[in-house]
Structures are given as C-alpha cells and as structure tokens.
C-alpha cells in the first residue's frame, strides 16, 4: 500500500486535484482510500456524488467512543473508500489535533488492514505545514510520498518551498520523500517553465502540468470528478495522465528548499516581477 499526502497553499486546488487523480487511479483498477485532513471536510465530496459525509470528529462528539468503521467511512466512485477527519467547532480547539485523533482512530478500527486490499491511501492536507497537527502525516510516517500542488503565483511557490522545509525536517525520522510538484495552472506567464525550474532547484520534478479548464468547475457543480462527469473530455485525460505518472513514479527525494532571495530571483527571471 502506497501512502501519499497532497499538500499545497490554501485554495490552490488540492482537494479537486486529489479527487480527480484518485478517480483516474480507481478507473485504472486501483483500490484507494482518501482521508480528508481539512476542517472544511470537502476532500471526498466529488467522489461521493456531492454527499457531505459526517466527519470522524463529529461522529466522536455525537456517539462517544462507540464508533464503528462503517460510521466514518463511505464508499464512493468505483469503490473508493472515503473519510473526513473534520475539525473542532469554529473558535474552539485545534484542527491539527483533530487530524491526529482521526488518523489514530482509523488505525484502531482497522481502516488500513490488509482485508481492504488497498493499493493507495491519499491524505488531502489543509494548506501549508504551519503546525504540528497538519504535519502529522509526514512527521509520523503516515505518508511516505508527498506531492505538492502549486502554480506560477508567488504565494503558491512560497508555500511549496515551505512544505519542502517540513519534508526536510522529518525526512530522517518519518522516512517521507517528495514525489514531485503538480502544477495546477493559473495561466501565469511562463508558468510551466517556471515550475519546472523550481522543481529542478528543489531537486525534484514537475510530475504533471494540469492546464486550466473551466470544465473542472462544471463537473464540480454537478458534484462529480471530471472522469465521472464526462470521461471523454480532454481534461479527463489530463487527470488520467497524472494518475499514471504517480502510479509509475520512481523519483522520491529529500528536497533542497530555497532561500527566499533565490525564490524571488526565480520569479524575476521568469517575468512575474517585471
């Protein structure tokens, strides 16, 4: 079972990219579990046809310790197994702590056991690695390979570099490695070349460039992944290609984060700052 975590700046399209990629893997016959690690609990909605599933933390709050696995895992598109960690009530408690509680409970209830014959587990993780809870998948060895969703926008690249610092910090203890950058295009000038160069400087690869297409939003409005909504659309092939590249990936590295002035010089070199 491969353990994958998807990180990236808030709003960059991690949940959308994760679910569309998982749909590509599921279509290819892989058995996948998706663990949403975001208080918004939107990491599995498209795989479940728009169903806002009850989160692990909500279930614990309402039912106490008497929780069964089927209470917190739902079957989605092509038998994907979907669960959402959820978060505390707004203004109370720590969302990162909630992820730790949820993942530990999933382990106790046997969600990762061999009987499920999982090929992959994907963790879709909120925003930047800013606190220990959100770093938990990489800190505790829950995830072994990380993919960072980014774009040619400065803050997305800044966040990607920060996440690489987190991976570097925990690489020895948790054994986690960076599998590559996924460029979720925002149609920035020279975007592909810039992210390829960022990847090169970090010591990794741009594993795929996902072109911007409003069809992704249309599929979302219909509560589906692109592959589920219209398997013949060119954008569906982009996610199939990304899924195939992840499935065949052999490049796993400890990244070399950039200094902030190196990052700024990259932006200047490729024309954003001009």
UniProtKB/Swiss-Prot annotation:
Binds 1 [4Fe-4S] cluster per dimer. Its cofactor is [4Fe-4S] cluster. [4Fe-4S] cluster binds at residues 94, 131. One of its GO terms (molecular function) is 4 iron, 4 sulfur cluster binding. Keywords: 4Fe-4S, ADP-ribosylation, ATP-binding, Iron, Iron-sulfur, Metal-binding, Nitrogen fixation, Nucleotide-binding, Oxidoreductase. The keyword rRNA-binding does not apply. It catalyses: N2 + 8 reduced [2Fe-2S]-[ferredoxin] + 16 ATP + 16 H2O = H2 + 8 oxidized [2Fe-2S]-[ferredoxin] + 2 NH4(+) + 16 ADP + 16 phosphate + 6 H(+). InterPro entries: NifH/chlL_CS, NifH/frxC, Nitrogenase_Fe_NifH, P-loop_NTPase. GO terms for biological process: nitrogen fixation. Its EC number is 1.18.6.1. ATP binds at residues 8-15. The reversible ADP-ribosylation of Arg-97 inactivates the nitrogenase reductase and regulates nitrogenase activity. The modification ADP-ribosylarginine is found at residue 97. Belongs to the NifH/BchL/ChlL family. HAMAP family: NifH. The key enzymatic reactions in nitrogen fixation are catalyzed by the nitrogenase complex, which has 2 components: the iron protein and the molybdenum-iron protein. Homodimer. This is Nitrogenase iron protein. It comes from Chlorobaculum tepidum (strain ATCC 49652 / DSM 12025 / NBRC 103806 / TLS).
């Amino acid at each position: 079972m491969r353990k994958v975590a998807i990180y990236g700046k808030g709003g960059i399209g991690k949940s959308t990219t994760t679910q569309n990629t998982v749909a590509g893997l599921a279509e290819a016959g892989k058995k996948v579990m998706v663990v949403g690690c975001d208080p918004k609990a939107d990491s599995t909605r498209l795989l479940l046809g728009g169903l806002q599933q009850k989160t692990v933390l909500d279930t614990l709050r309402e039912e106490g310790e008497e929780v069964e696995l089927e209470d917190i895992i739902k079957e989605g598109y092509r038998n994907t197994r979907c669960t959402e960690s959820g978060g505390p009530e707004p203004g109370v408690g720590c969302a990162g702590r909630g992820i730790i509680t949820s993942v530990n409970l999933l382990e106790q209830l046997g969600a990762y056991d061999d009987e499920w014959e999982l090929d992959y587990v994907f963790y879709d993780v909120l925003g930047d690695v800013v606190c220990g809870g959100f770093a938990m998948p990489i800190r505790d060895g829950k995830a072994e390979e990380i993919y960072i969703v980014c774009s040619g926008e400065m803050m997305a690249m800044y966040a990607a570099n920060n996440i690489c610092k987190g991976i570097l910090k925990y690489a020895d203890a948790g054994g986690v490695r960076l599998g590559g950058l996924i460029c979720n295009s925002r149609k920035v000038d020279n975007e592909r070349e810039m992210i390829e160069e960022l990847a090169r400087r970090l010591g990794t690869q741009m594993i795929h460039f996902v072109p911007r297409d409003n069809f992704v939003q249309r599929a979302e409005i219909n509560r589906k992944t692109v592959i589920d909504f219209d398997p013949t659309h060119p954008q569906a092939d982009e996610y199939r290609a990304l899924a195939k590249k992840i499935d065949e990936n052999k490049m796993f590295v400890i990244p070399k984060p950039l200094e902030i002035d190196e990052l700024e010089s990259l932006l200047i070199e490729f024309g954003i700052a001009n």
